[in-house]
Amino acid sequence: LRRSPRFKAMALIPMQDPPSAVAELRRAVTELGMVGAYIPSNGLKKHLSAKEFWPIYEEAQKLDCAVGIHGGSYSDLGFNTFTKFPGTRALGMPVPLAIAMTGMIQDGVWDAFPKLRVGFMEGGTGWIPMIIDRLEREQEYGELHCQRPVLDYFTSGSFYVGCEGNERALSNVVNLIGPQPCMFASDFPHDLVVQRVPLGLLGVEL
């Protein structure tokens, strides 16, 4: 964006072809000046924690860039039998983020790439206490084999989450994992009500 150097771009990379995704991530960061890549929370043939995607995370760690996981892909989540859309949208954002984070913990993504930085976006923060509680129970049962306590994966500087100031769960989440992982989400460049868009942004050129 030419409007301000404070705006940074994230690349969309072809996750269906991991070698091409690695090459595109490298090009986006080293040639185009982007700061990372956005990938879908679900909808791929395999979970984001599948080994075939690990070269992407390895490259992101090597480049010291971020990976953003975006909620909102409603496929294969059981919403196809809902009779109204609001329930799909309400759950379709946080649920796949919870699934993605769970897989990345239990399948060892962060154990393999401890400096990988991942942001979980558009799903709020309410899902975080739930999976921490549930996964800690699995660790206590001896069924979840991780190199660290579950909470550490949220507080080590690798995990980030987009949040909104009016979330009821936000204060509890901050008490649980601290404020550092929480990023205020403006949802720029779109807004549900155009009158709320600051006048200074109306002239932004892409």
Which residues fall in each region the model found?
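Catalytic pocket-lining loop regions of alpha/beta-barrel enzymes
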Residues: S4-K8, P19, L25-M183
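His/Asp/Glu-enriched, well-ordered alpha-helical/loop segment
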Residues: Q180-L206
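Short histidine/acidic/glycine/proline-rich micro-motifs that form metal-
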Residues: M15, G43-L44, P189-H190
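Catalytic pocket of metal/acid-base enzymes, prominently hydrolases
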Residues: L1
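Catalytic donor nucleotide-activated moiety binding site of glycosyltransferases and closely related
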Residues: A11-I13
